[in-house]
Amino acid sequence: MAAALLLYLPLLPGLAGAFNLDAENVIGRRGEPGSLFGFSLAMHRQLQPQEKRLLLVGAPREKAFPSQQANRTGGLYSCDITSSDTRCTRVVFDEDTDPKMESKEDQWMGVTVQSQGPGGNVVTCAHRYEKRQYVNTVQETRDIIGRCYVLSQDLTIKDDMDNGVWSFCDGRLRGHEKFGSCQQGVAATFTRDYHYIVFGAPGTYNWKGVVRAEQKNQTFYDLGIFDDGPYEVGDESRQDKNLVPVPANSYLGFSLDSGKGIVSQDEMTFVSGAPRANHSGAVVLLKKEKNQRALSLEHMFEGEGLASSFGYDVAVVDLNSDGWQDIVVGAPQYFDRSGDIGGAVYIYINQRGKWEGIKPIRLNGTADSMFGLAVENVGDINQDGYPDIAVGAPYDGFGKVYIYHGSKNGINTEPAQILDGEKTGTNFFGYSIAGNMDLDKNSYPDIAVGSLSDSVSVFRSRPVISITKSITVQPDKLDLKKKNPEDPSEIWMDVKACFQYTANPRNLNPRIKINYTFEAENERRQLGLPSRVRFKDYLSDQFTASTTLIGQNSKRCVTAKLVLQEKIKDKLRPIPIAVSVNIAGLESGSSSTRKERALPDLIPILNSNESETKITKVEFLKEGCGEDNECHSNLKLQYRFCTREGNEDRFTYLPIENGIPVLVLKDQKDIALEITVTNNPSDARNPQKDGEDAYEAKLIATFPDSLTYSAFREMRGYPEKQLTCGANQNGSQAECELGNPFKRNSNVTFYLILSTTKVNVDTTDLDINLKLETTSTQVNSTAITASAKVVLELLLSLTGVAKPSQVYFGGNIVGESAMKSEDNIGNLIEYEFRVTNLGRPLKTFGTASLDIQWPKEISNGKWLLYLMKIESKGLEKVSCQPQNEINVLHVAESHNSRRKREIAEKQLTDSKTFSLFSERKYKTLDCKVNAQCVDIRCPLKGFDSKASILLRSRLWNSTFLEEFSKMNYLDILVRASISVPAAAKNVKLTNEAAQVRVTVFPAKPVALYTGVPWWIIAVAIFAGVLMLALLVFLLWKCGFFKRSKKDHYDATYHKAEIHAQPSDKERLTSDA
């Protein structure tokens, strides 16, 4: 079949809201337990011998009459709901039994019941009625042929030929292949023209099923018309199963309805469901064949879901009132793979008798609800001109009945009302439904709902009325300069509202008490804004009172005084005044359509298609605006970013790069945004075009997460300063009121001071949304974005120190495997790097890191500095990476490092006494030249102003003995720097790298002094003394020690002094 339009009920909000079926004053009737009282229902109007409006209830498991020679046979009950007697009366018929010919045990009388209409007949059936032959013999046979009874309008069997038993399968060929299991009466109905009675027999022809229509109108006989039927699927004369348009086990005739205007406006069409046809179900449209006694196929609708029982129930109803009957089909066992759908109803909207290619509307029920087990034309229950339908879902909780209203488009797919069995305490509520008749005589059709719990509920329809509302205000325009002459301190308005109602039918004229509510400024109140007016007698902007409407089209008017509040801001937008109504009840003594009523009148309900509220608006006479009383403003905005010097109100514009302001943020706490707003005419040659007063003019500034509002400074304003600014709780938005009104040719310049404390390393831009708003007409009110680029300048310093700065090596060479304690490695060296922040707290920029180039090995891979441990001061617990470079050999820590360092320093001091005579050899060990280094990164978590990283290390003694024993000393360089993640984008880092130098000396000059014999020293001393003696002797021989005359002495002295240069002593000293 064609794909269906879907509607899933649980997705619709507010479906439980009631419309005009009264769910509070439900009329209930109960039957005998276990009787299935309420299995079938029909409303019947008796005209003779007296008028009665009855509810007929089938109870197919009711106990038998004594004369029926059975336990349970089923029965039919008549209920007068207008009576104070809550008991229903059992209809007496089918009392006798011939046990030799039949069995009525469990025949299920009352399985179906239908009324022909006002003054018409009633049909009820027992589809399990058994026809017997050869009782108490071995040839005994039992055929479940079923049969029906037709009763006259007063529920009795007349002697007329059309009353009594109707059993067309009786006397035909037996066996399930023919008519032996035809089960006539599973469904039965009358055509609406009173001409035919229609029976369904789904067990005929191996449960193919047949539909039979027989003439049922006394008028035909009076007119001499005797040859109108009967008509039957398979042909009543030929009884040919091959003419049945569905396969075996289809159950054709399981549900029935009929009507004209289905295929043709003049011809009757019979509609029947076959819920097991082709394993999914089908609905067939049947027509009478001329000159034959056959019903033949006109069209077939096929179910779309396997085992969905499509056609379990059908209803013919003109939903859109276009004169063509539409078709409603129930498929209570439809489901989908998701498991969310439990039953469906298909709505086929008639296209002027054309059914090919029609796409049905599918209404879906909730899971396991059996939605669509019963579908019923319940008439126009709200009297809107479109018939309505009811859908039963007996397994939806306690059971529910969904009411859908017809409309000009076919059907409103949202239920107008849901009746719930839980409220009546009824299980399996909605198994059967009857309607389309007014039981309580208020001109609105009512609904009866049956169940499998031996109970029936009747829901009466409340009259639907439409109340016309009008509201006027004097004066209709407010002049703020014109005060009330009675009280010059106030401005008054007179409000008048009038009401009248209409209803269907036109003769329905109850006296209705209504509650009316005057309400002003509802939208402002919902926004949390104060109202600009109040009602004088109630000191509030709303009040409720009551009045009475005495009948249809009778007008009733009420008045109230409205007072304008003082010092209002909004002087441009109109003041809305609304009046709404609801029905409070009926006044005592209210007349109805009938003078005497056994049931109390129901309170009418307002038409749901009409608004309960009527609104009018009062305009202001506006100053500074054009002759059209409309204000056309021309607000313009300019902005510039500034820095603020300290806490003083001195502002400096930011530098511009590529057209974008650049904010270099060091230690500033605030920045400022200079804003200028003007309201000048856009065209000086046509100043009346715009630039008029801007009422409630304001600027709304929305800041990014990195900025918060701090304050504002108004620098200048023309013609007067009237600026006020305020912010929301977290400072993310500021609102500045420019003036009310911000007059023509006004301008204002002010600064928004913004805190930068939330600016962090991820902040690359500042985008501030600026929007001008006014209640005047502003042609261009688009928001603009003020943008600036952010550069963060970090003022960080880094210093480093090593303790001690000079160490020694010496002793014996020890292998790596022998290192058990750090003392075995070598002397202790502790490095400390101090980081100081001179600018903004670093926490706002994220996490900085200290990067250290650690000289781990010399160029040939031998150990240089062994890193034992890393600690911190002024930080959270430090975790440097890579962790596997710390104490790689897992040697034990030593706690005597201080003493060993002091001994080392003393030995180093002693060893320096020999350096005078050493050859001065030295070397620098540097990561950039001859050392293999590891990059160690230490995050400075929690760092704010000061922090220190301490590295505890050991000089690898054996490496220095092996590689550097001939060196007088060596320098080891360790470098460190600071980095910040994402610094390349917007962070300017001004720190300098730190370099720490440690000098290493050998413990003693091993290669210079080891192995010198003692005798060499003695010979050297003797040679020195001998040479000194020889020198003295030579001087004596030369007369050096004699006294001479002065002139000779002077010459001799000079000569001797010349010969003594250079002296032996000086030469020896030089050689040494």
From Swiss-Prot:
Keywords: Calcium, Cell adhesion, Cell membrane, Cleavage on pair of basic residues, Disulfide bond, Glycoprotein, Integrin, Lipoprotein, Membrane, Metal-binding, Palmitate, Phosphoprotein, Receptor, Repeat, Signal, Transmembrane, Transmembrane helix
UniProt binding sites for Ca(2+) 1: D318, N320, D322, D326
SMART domains to which the protein is assigned, alphabetical: Int_alpha
Post-translational modification, as annotated: Phosphorylated in vivo.
Keyword check for Signal: yes
Function per UniProt: Integrin alpha-6/beta-1 (ITGA6:ITGB1) is a receptor for laminin on platelets. Integrin alpha-6/beta-1 (ITGA6:ITGB1) is present in oocytes and is involved in sperm-egg fusion. Integrin alpha-6/beta-4 (ITGA6:ITGB4) is a receptor for laminin in epithelial cells and it plays a critical structural role in the hemidesmosome.
Name of the protein: Integrin alpha-6
Lineage: Eukaryota, Metazoa, Chordata, Craniata, Vertebrata
